A protein has these predicted regions:
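Bacterial N-terminal signal peptides that target proteins for export
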Residues: 1-9
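Long, low-hydrophobicity ectodomains and other hydrophilic envelope-associated domains
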Residues: 22-225
């Protein structure tokens, strides 16, 4: 724990120094013990980078991005990460966690800092492009592109019933960047969206999504508006 605190303090001091640099000077630092989640710093701008892979191009969706080996059958992207690292990176990027969706006694949408989700692609020619994540998602009822950004709901941390003294971050069960409302979501959309399989609101926009297995980088940028 003491080592982690020292590392966190060192990182915060580095971020403070980097924020004074020109925006053209881009730095990237790994967040967590394993590769997969990064904090990108360009002057005062901080963005979270998540290495991911395309796993679904057709059909209905509950997730935009899930953790590997969880909900790949209902998510466009998967990432082999610990979602706690993504949460920590968002905090370092200046996001404030709010609260997950509440279903009873009355519906309250997820809250928290607004987060813009983009996908960074590298073409066969080596050129890098970024497109809005919501452009890969189509509303089943209207046929139009998803018109909402995400919010940093922050998921939940509970005691592990099988290992006393251990904590569990519930978004690690799959709900990292959600399209259906889940009270375990790290990022959720702040509008009512069913998780009932018969009434899912969103589907993959197949023609816009690259082939299965394509490696991408998901970019999370905290809105300052």
């Amino acid at each position: 724990m003491k080592t982690n605190m020292i590392l966190s303090l060192s990182l915060l001091l580095a971020l403070l120094a980097w924020s004074q640099e020109p925006a053209a000077q881009v730095r990237k630092v790994q967040v967590g013990d394993k590769p997969g989640v990064w904090l990108e710093v360009a002057g005062p701008t901080r963005r979270v980078l998540i290495e991911a892979e395309v796993v679904k191009r057709e059909g209905e969706l509950e997730e935009f991005l899930c953790r590997s080996r969880t909900k790949e059958h209902e998510s466009i992207l998967k990432a082999d990460i610990d979602a706690r690292d993504a949460h920590k990176a968002l905090l370092l990027a200046g996001a404030e966690s709010g609260a997950p969706v509440q279903f009873a006694p009355v519906y309250k949408p997820a809250s928290g800092s607004k987060v813009k989700v983009s996908v960074r692609l590298t073409g066969e020619d080596g050129k890098v492009s970024e497109i809005p994540g919501k452009s890969w998602v189509r509303n089943r009822k209207t046929g139009k592109e998803l018109d909402s950004d995400w919010v940093f709901a922050g998921s939940k941390i509970l005691d592990d019933m099988n290992m006393p003294g251990r904590k569990v971050y519930l978004a690690n069960d799959g709900d990292v960047i959600c399209l259906s409302n889940f009270d375990t979501a790290m990022l959720d959309i702040p509008v009512a969206s069913s998780k009932d399989n018969a009434n899912l609101d969103f589907q993959a926009w197949t023609e816009r999504i690259p082939k299965l297995g394509t490696k991408v980088v998901v970019v999370l940028e905290v809105s300052r508006k």
